[in-house]
A protein has these predicted regions:
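Conserved class I S-adenosyl-L-methionine
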Residues: 1-40, 42-49, 54, 58, 141-170
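A short acidic, Gly/Pro-enriched loop at the edge of an enzyme's catalytic core
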Residues: 100-110
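A short glycine-rich, Lys/Arg-flanked "PGG" loop and its adjoining helix->strand segment in the class I
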Residues: 126-138
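Short alpha-helix
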Residues: 182-199
Length: 199
């Protein structure tokens, strides 16, 4: 089992978005998705890295046609158990790096709200974005989430007192950028890195 499968097999992804701070994330994200949907009904939506289906299921219940792609079998199992009786959602096992099962410009909206957390080099990050762009209609919307370095530094290292642990494990650069590998699970980025990937 790889690091990601092992992590999510033992992590309560359902509980994360149900927590107080998780609700802020969920409601804020849904507000922007609804802004993109506008007055029109029945959008075709792809969620890449759908987790246990919190966004995908809610959007399907609102009448949209949803394809939900999830990498980890544990989360996919949970999502599949929750969609019984919902006919306008289709789940898939797969990776954000390969969306070849989907045609070009197939979706009005593509959500990439988790995969970038687990991409550890620029080549993979660019590939995820290229695939999302390819499957999204020219006038469509793509939503992408990242783990931001500075927020993590403030919350995890300073507030939680973990800075010396990171220093001792050589997980910080001289300018306090978190160094991540696959075993660390999450890749922290700065705005300038996102800008460089998007260039």
């Amino acid at each position: 089992m790889n690091y990601l499968e092992n992590y999510y097999a033992n992590y309560d992804e359902e509980g994360r978005l149900a927590s107080n701070h998780g609700q802020v994330e969920y409601l804020t994200t849904m507000k922007y998705i609804h802004d993109a949907i506008g007055d029109s009904r029945k959008k075709k939506i792809l969620e890449v890295g759908a987790g246990t289906g919190r966004y995908s299921i809610a959007l399907a219940k609102q009448g949209h046609q949803v394809d939900a792609l999830e990498y980890t079998f544990h989360n996919l199992e949970i999502m599949n158990s929750k969609i019984v009786g919902i006919s306008n959602i289709t789940t898939h096992h797969g990776t954000a790096l390969d969306l070849s099962r989907f045609e070009d410009e197939a979706f009005d909206i593509t959500l990439v709200l988790g995969p970038m957390y687990h991409m550890y080099n620029d080549e993979d990050k660019k590939k995820v974005l290229e695939e999302a762009i390819r499957v999204t209609k020219k006038e469509g919307y793509i939503f992408v989430a990242y783990c931001m370095n500075e927020a993590t530094m403030i919350q995890f290292t300073f507030k939680a007192g973990k800075i010396w642990e990171l220093v001792e494990n050589h997980m910080l650069t001289d300018d306090f950028h978190c160094i991540s590998e696959e075993k660390d699970l999450f890749e922290m980025v700065r705005l300038e890195e996102i800008d460089a990937i998007n260039a």
